[in-house]
């Protein structure tokens, strides 16, 4: 995982390339904070070693929501860190977590996340739906009335707002946790005749 230090990742890549010399592509999960501890030169070196794509769990581009879910960064840092990947030649997916802001902040979550994503160059925008698991802090907050989760219909409305504002040239993939399965290149601009 990209959470490891540059030196540790480099050692792992060396081992992989020695044992499997035909490997050309390595993909891994990442957080925005995992990019922060790597310089552009280090990212370029990791790209040369075969780390070609990251799947970044952004979840939201809304500062209130990012703080609420304790991501450990603000929206401006998403842009700053992810643009380092563009410069290093590493492609990336960005994820939007549908429903994570709750009812009161749903609109801002959708709008502000689209605004952030529109400033970046993801190859894929992935969306997943919030699932409240037993024995989690968010489930307890829901039971105490401190968090008001979206209904399935409200989640689709939030997703619609997000997609209407999304203008980046990327493929869209929805996770099975969303009530509607969407996949395709329909975010790409259409050519007028």
Model-derived segments and spans:
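Radical SAM enzyme core and accessory elements
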Residues: 181-193
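Alpha-helix N-cap and loop-to-helix initiation/capping positions
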Residues: 4, 8, 41, 70-77, ...
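Acidic (Asp/Glu)-rich catalytic clusters
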Residues: 13-21, 43-50, 83-87
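Conserved C-terminal portion of the radical SAM core fold
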Residues: 76-138, 152-176
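Short, glycine-/aromatic-enriched active-site segment of Class I SAM-dependent methyltransferases
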Residues: 138-146
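Short, small-residue-enriched loops and turns at beta-alpha junctions
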Residues: 2-5, 32-36, 99-105, 133, ...
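Mid-domain alpha/beta scaffold segments of enzyme catalytic cores
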Residues: 7-12, 16, 38
């Amino acid at each position: 995982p990209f959470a490891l230090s540059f030196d540790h990742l480099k050692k792992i890549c060396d081992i992989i390339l020695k044992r499997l010399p035909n490997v050309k592509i390595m993909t891994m999960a990442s957080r925005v904070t995992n990019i922060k501890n790597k310089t552009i030169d280090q990212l370029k070196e990791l790209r040369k070693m075969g780390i070609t794509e990251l799947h970044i769990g952004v979840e939201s581009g809304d500062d209130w929501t990012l703080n609420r879910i304790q991501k450990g960064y603000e929206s401006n840092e998403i842009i700053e860190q992810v643009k380092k990947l563009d410069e290093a030649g590493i492609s990336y997916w960005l994820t939007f977590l549908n429903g994570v802001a709750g009812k009161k902040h749903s609109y801002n979550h959708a709008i502000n996340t689209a605004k952030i994503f529109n400033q970046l160059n993801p190859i894929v925008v992935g969306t997943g739906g919030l699932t409240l698991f037993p024995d989690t802090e968010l489930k307890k907050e829901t039971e105490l009335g401190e968090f008001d989760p979206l209904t399935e219909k409200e989640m689709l409305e939030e997703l619609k707002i997000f997609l209407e504002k999304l203008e980046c040239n990327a493929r869209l993939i929805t996770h099975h946790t969303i009530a509607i399965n969407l996949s395709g290149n329909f975010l790409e601009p259409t050519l007028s005749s």
